[in-house]
């Protein structure tokens, strides 16, 4: 919004020439991060007080860690504050005509709505199960598939009209359409090498990345500050990839596919990082507020959607390795328990407790040790991910 306003003012008088600074992505990215950060810090105490007054407190599982019982009643659903800061900061500083920003915002808010309903049922309606798993996965799949279907054509074309034309061309051709190389699966550390996916392959991969990232972040959000800092780190790095991909000069120099308009996602990623840091101010141990599913599901989906647009699905898995391992630990734990129970009549566990961060707590690690060490691991993985910018 502000870039459009600045451009309009410049047409009125040359005295507004200093507003040309609003044309620069880097300036707007910094301002978006600061806007989200300051908004979050200012509104945080009010939101926490309000959640406390409404008795929207986090229920703690009786079979979990004993050290977590003291957290019972801590305000939750604080992720709504994160989303509010992201949306306002993004809309203020982004080019509102950019279609990629709108699709990321819609996916983020869609998954946030799913998380809101889940949290509301758990906390307000006192339903320990919240939204039923099949219901949750249905809506996640619905939003994820719609986004994937739009993106498969949007990445190949530069306007929504051309996206529609390409879609109908795909339908008329009997669902057989050759996509450009930039719509393939890019392999990191290799120059201009991509694996062709086709429309169906692209949609399936994008769906798995968006929905998988959403649930992986949600599973990671089990300790004070554990999920939000990796989200900030990975989101910031994805913003750099968006900047490179959206630039004709940098993408050519670094052998990346050029996707016009993707650079504006740097604004969204910066806003997400700023809002995340503001939330961490109140979420650090001992946490004053939890983000809840409304925040975790939305932020994970946002990371996944941005990664799909900038064609860095594999790099997302690298940088978000903590999220990947946390999700895998749950799947392995459940699968192994069912397998051993079916085979011997008694279920066995691979880990002392899943997700993995609880395994380390059961092994004697302090909560803060688990959190900070997972942060350090994420920092290292993000450096590996960023190295793919040049090591190609």
Swiss-Prot record:
It is a multi-pass membrane protein. Pathway: Cell wall biogenesis; peptidoglycan biosynthesis. It catalyses: UDP-N-acetyl-alpha-D-muramoyl-L-alanyl-gamma-D-glutamyl-meso-2,6-diaminopimeloyl-D-alanyl-D-alanine + di-trans,octa-cis-undecaprenyl phosphate = di-trans,octa-cis-undecaprenyl diphospho-N-acetyl-alpha-D-muramoyl-L-alanyl-D-glutamyl-meso-2,6-diaminopimeloyl-D-alanyl-D-alanine + UMP. GO terms for molecular function: metal ion binding; phospho-N-acetylmuramoyl-pentapeptide-transferase activity; UDP-N-acetylmuramoyl-L-alanyl-D-glutamyl-meso-2,6-diaminopimelyl-D-alanyl-D-alanine:undecaprenyl-phosphate transferase activity. The chain crosses the membrane at residues 28-48, 76-96, 100-120, 137-157, 193-213, 225-245, 262-282, 289-309, 314-334, 369-389. One of its GO terms (cellular component) is plasma membrane. Keywords: Cell cycle, Cell division, Cell inner membrane, Cell membrane, Cell shape, Cell wall biogenesis/degradation, Magnesium, Membrane, Metal-binding, Peptidoglycan synthesis, Transferase, Transmembrane, Transmembrane helix. Its EC number is 2.7.8.13. Catalyzes the initial step of the lipid cycle reactions in the biosynthesis of the cell wall peptidoglycan: transfers peptidoglycan precursor phospho-MurNAc-pentapeptide from UDP-MurNAc-pentapeptide onto the lipid carrier undecaprenyl phosphate, yielding undecaprenyl-pyrophosphoryl-MurNAc-pentapeptide, known as lipid I. HAMAP family: MraY. PANTHER family: PHOSPHO-N-ACETYLMURAMOYL-PENTAPEPTIDE-TRANSFERASE, PHOSPHO-N-ACETYLMURAMOYL-PENTAPEPTIDE-TRANSFERASE HOMOLOG. This is Phospho-N-acetylmuramoyl-pentapeptide-transferase. It comes from Albidiferax ferrireducens (strain ATCC BAA-621 / DSM 15236 / T118) (Rhodoferax ferrireducens). The gene is mraY.
């Amino acid at each position: 919004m502000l870039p459009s306003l600045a451009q309009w003012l410049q047409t009125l008088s040359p005295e507004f020439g200093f507003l040309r600074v609003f044309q620069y992505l880097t300036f707007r990215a910094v301002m978006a991060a600061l806007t989200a950060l300051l908004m979050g810090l200012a509104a945080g105490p009010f939101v926490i007080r309000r959640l406390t007054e409404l008795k929207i407190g986090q229920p703690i599982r009786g079979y979990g860690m004993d050290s977590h019982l003291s957290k019972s009643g801590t305000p939750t659903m604080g992720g709504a504050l994160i989303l509010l800061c992201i949306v306002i900061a993004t809309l203020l500083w982004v080019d509102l005509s950019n279609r990629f920003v709108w699709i990321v915002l819609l996916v983020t808010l869609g998954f946030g709505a799913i998380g809101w309903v889940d949290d509301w049922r758990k906390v307000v309606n006192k339903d320990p199960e919240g939204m039923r798993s099949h219901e949750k996965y249905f809506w996640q799949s619905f939003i994820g598939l719609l986004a994937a279907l739009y993106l498969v054509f949007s990445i190949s074309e530069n306007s929504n009209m051309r996206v529609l034309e390409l879609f109908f061309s795909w339908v008329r051709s009997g669902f057989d359409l050759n996509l450009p190389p930039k719509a393939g699966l890019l392999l990191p550390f290799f120059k201009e090498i991509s694996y062709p996916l086709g429309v169906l392959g692209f949609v399936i991969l994008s769906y798995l990345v968006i929905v998988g990232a959403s649930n992986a972040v949600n599973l990671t959000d089990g300790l004070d500050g554990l999920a939000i800092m990796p989200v900030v780190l990975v989101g910031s790095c994805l913003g750099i990839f968006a900047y490179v991909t959206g630039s004709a000069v940098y993408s050519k120099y670094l052998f990346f596919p050029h996707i016009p308009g993707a650079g504006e996602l740097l604004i969204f990623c910066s806003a997400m990082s700023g809002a995340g840091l503001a939330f961490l101010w109140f979420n650090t141990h001992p946490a004053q507020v939890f983000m809840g599913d409304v925040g975790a599901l939305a932020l994970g989906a946002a990371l996944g959607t941005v990664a799909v647009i900038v064609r860095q699905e594999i790099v997302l898995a690298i940088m978000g390795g903590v999220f990947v391992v946390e999700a895998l630990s749950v799947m392995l734990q459940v699968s192994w328990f069912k397998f051993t129970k079916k085979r011997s009549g008694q279920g066995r566990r691979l880990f002392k407790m899943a997700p993995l961060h609880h395994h380390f707590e059961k092994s004697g690690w302090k909560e803060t040790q688990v959190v900070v060490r997972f942060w350090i691991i994420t920092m290292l993985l993000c450096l590996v991910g960023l190295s793919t910018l040049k090591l190609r």
